[in-house]
Amino acid sequence: QSGVIFANKDIDTANKLKDLLITNYYRISTSTDINGVEVCAAIKNIFAMAIGAATGLNKTKIKDNTYLNTSAALFRQSIYEMEIFVDFLNGKKETVKSLAGLGDLYVSAAGGRNSKMGALIGDGIVFSKATKNNMPNVTVEGAELIFEIGQKVKKDFDEKKLPLMIAMINAIIYDKKLEIKWENF
């Protein structure tokens, strides 16, 4: 099974496309929130890196799935900050709780380039070294987006409002170890 979301300012057009392409294994939802869907598609990559960092950020000495609680905390914060960011860019907060937000973030955080880079950063490896030694010639969309929007985000938002996103921005742009201010969650 697979699910996607089609966004169009005209819901009838989106629904016609849905009717043409839907199958018993390819499920399609529709939305008129073009801004929200597009913003979620982009910023979920930043948050997938953050969630991927959980294995290294977990500070217990127990070796098993204890990082899952850290992942859950990061996932929840990611959704919260995605809502703030989508709203800021004139999207609808509820879009974050659709396939465009929650669904896409889950898939990206479960595996892939952003999650892999996040795991390296969570282990204390700075971005430039992680890129050079572990992921050369690999495009990490979340990092690319941070280089594009990071400074503007830091200018427009207080660190207490988007603590996770700003922690990722600081780690990538300034090439330093990831420092999350958990007290701001």
Functional labels for PLM-detected ranges:
Residues 15-19, 47-54, 76-83, 87, ...:
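Predominant activation on well-ordered alpha-helical scaffold segments within soluble catalytic domains
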Residues 111-185:
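C-terminal active-site/capping subdomain that shapes the small-molecule cofactor and substrate pocket
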Residues 44, 56, 60, 105-108, ...:
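Short, electropositive, low-hydrophobicity segments enriched in small/polar residues
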Residues 37-38, 107, 138:
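Short, small-residue-enriched loops and turns at beta-alpha junctions
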Residues 68-103, 110-111, 123-137:
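Small-residue-rich helix-loop
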Residues 1-95:
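Internal alpha-helical scaffold of NAD(P)-dependent oxidoreductase catalytic cores
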